[in-house]
Swiss-Prot record:
Pfam families to which the protein is assigned, alphabetical: EFP (PF01132), EFP_N (PF08207), Elong-fact-P_C (PF09285)
Keywords: Cytoplasm, Elongation factor, Protein biosynthesis
Name listed for the protein in its UniProt record: Elongation factor P
Gene Ontology biological process terms, A to Z: peptide biosynthetic process
InterPro entries: Elong-fact-P_C, NA-bd_OB-fold, Rib_uL2_dom2, Transl_elong_fac_P/YeiP, Transl_elong_KOW-like, Transl_elong_P/YeiP_cen, Transl_elong_P/YeiP_CS, Transl_elongation_fac_P
Molecular-function annotations in GO: translation elongation factor activity
Family listed: Belongs to the elongation factor P family.
């Protein structure tokens, strides 16, 4: 149990039959009435984001999330197979668990699998990945007035905006948080 007064960003709690991650919180002490904590929470099972208000001093249950380092092996239809690096145990996850993550997953990539009481909640990717450009228009020399961009498709099928100097075959560093171009590798 933890007091809502001790909330921290990234804390996982169990409230209303759900496992929630604290994204943001604010302690509020109005001039009249008692203090409360306004929080923004993400449901780790569904991905839904909800704002919730707790009375000051209220206690909530902490949820101990287990993070296991695993290696992505391969896709088998709509199932994706991961292997635990210590035990070599294989875990299969359906594609609907990995909708966004599939844009960046490559064979042999190391990821963190998050679970709570043996229930898999999701996959945490590395902050950046290196992917090869498979398709893009050729850049036009001299057409760089205002940091212009063009569309490029990488080896996983993900499409993003890149600077004009990027060509097919280039390896890009991509931010997995928002899917944006960072640099060439």
């Amino acid at each position: 149990m933890i007091s809502v007064n001790d909330f921290k960003t990234g804390l996982t709690i169990s409230v209303d039959n759900g496992i929630w991650k604290v994204l943001d919180f604010q302690h509020v002490k109005p001039g009249k009435g008692s203090a409360f904590v306004r929080s923004k929470l993400r449901n780790l099972r569904t991905g839904a984001i909800q704002e919730k208000t707790f009375r000051g001093g209220e206690k909530v249950e902490t949820a101990l999330i287990e993070n296991r380092r695993m290696q992505y092996l391969y896709a088998d239809g709509d199932t994706h197979v991961f292997m635990d690096n210590q035990t070599f145990e294989q875990t299969e996850l359906p594609a609907d668990y990995l909708e966004y993550e599939l844009n960046f997953l490559k064979a042999n990539m190391e990821v963190q699998i998050q679970s709570y009481e043996n229930e898999t909640l999701g996959v945490e990717l590395p902050k950046t990945v290196e992917l090869t450009v498979t398709e893009t228009e050729p850049g036009i020399k001299g057409d760089t007035a205002n940091g212009a961009t063009k569309s490029a498709t990488v080896e996983t099928g993900y499409t993003l905006n890149v600077p004009l100097f990027v060509n097919e075959g280039d390896v890009l560093v991509i931010n997995t948080g928002d899917g944006s171009y960072i640099s060439r590798a």
